Amino acid sequence: MTDMYSLFVAFILGVVEGLTEFLPVSSTGHMIIVGELLGFTGDKAKTFEVIIQLGSILAVVVVFWRRLFGLIGIHFGAVPHEGKTNGHLTLGHILLAMIPAVILGLAFHDVIKALFDPKSVMYALVAGGVLLLAAEWLKPKNPKAVGLDDITYRQAFAIGCFQCLALWPGFSRSGATISGGMLVGVNRYAASEFSFILAVPMMIGASGLDLYKSLHFLTLGDLPMFAVGFITAFIVALIAIKTFLSLIKRISFVPFAIYRFIVAAVVYWVFM
């Protein structure tokens, strides 16, 4: 039976997951710290994290549902064109961006899972922060892609290559893809939108594989806890995505980079 403390843990971790999954700050680093502080670790904790990630993914689907359905040929009215060219974001862009990480992720799955330790995550937090700073300082002054529909196939594939950095736990998938997009000439806002849309198939695939391998850790008694975490992550992620997309029109990623360095210092202080 699930006790009240377990539900409290589920709520807190759901908030952390929802807040950090799509921000360039690394949800993995935060989940490790908070999980350790709450005494929630081990195989069941890892399974729980996979399930609440699905709640965050659902939030992206809700925000971008019209665009996502349009990519697979199901249209619910016209999708507003975003950009200055006559191009259109297609399923081909998403598939191209998925290829590099899918290949490396499947080839090195066990190696990647072995990197889920505090020391490795700490270094990834720092490296991801450096990439965010590099993206802000080295990005083209006049991005070629000012909207989502301006992104070329070449840019999509390049963003997919940057996404491979996120296979290093703690690096941040959104941080890697948004930074990569900016460096190859995509507007910060458009790069963020593309990152969120790309997250749906990538995270469903990765989470589905992890869940399949850890189903034996689930029991009927865990369902209330997992439901609380899932619903909390969904609601918080929904708010976080909309707030983030509004915020990045006005600020750079420098504050996020600084925050990552602070989190890395906390990981060092807690675990080293």
UniProtKB/Swiss-Prot annotation:
It is a multi-pass membrane protein. GO terms for cellular component: plasma membrane. Belongs to the UppP family. It holds the Pfam family BacA. It comes from the Bacteria. The keyword tRNA processing does not apply. Its EC number is 3.6.1.27. It is found in: Cell inner membrane. It comes from Yersinia pestis. The chain crosses the membrane at residues 5-25, 45-65, 88-108, 114-134, 153-172, 189-209, 221-241, 251-271. GO terms for molecular function: undecaprenyl-diphosphatase activity. Keywords: Antibiotic resistance, Cell inner membrane, Cell membrane, Cell shape, Cell wall biogenesis/degradation, Hydrolase, Membrane, Peptidoglycan synthesis, Transmembrane, Transmembrane helix. Catalyzes the dephosphorylation of undecaprenyl diphosphate (UPP). Confers resistance to bacitracin. Bacitracin is thought to be involved in the inhibition of peptidoglycan synthesis by sequestering undecaprenyl diphosphate, thereby reducing the pool of lipid carrier available. GO terms for biological process: cell wall organization; peptidoglycan biosynthetic process; peptidoglycan metabolic process; regulation of cell shape; response to antibiotic. It catalyses: di-trans,octa-cis-undecaprenyl diphosphate + H2O = di-trans,octa-cis-undecaprenyl phosphate + phosphate + H(+). This is Undecaprenyl-diphosphatase.
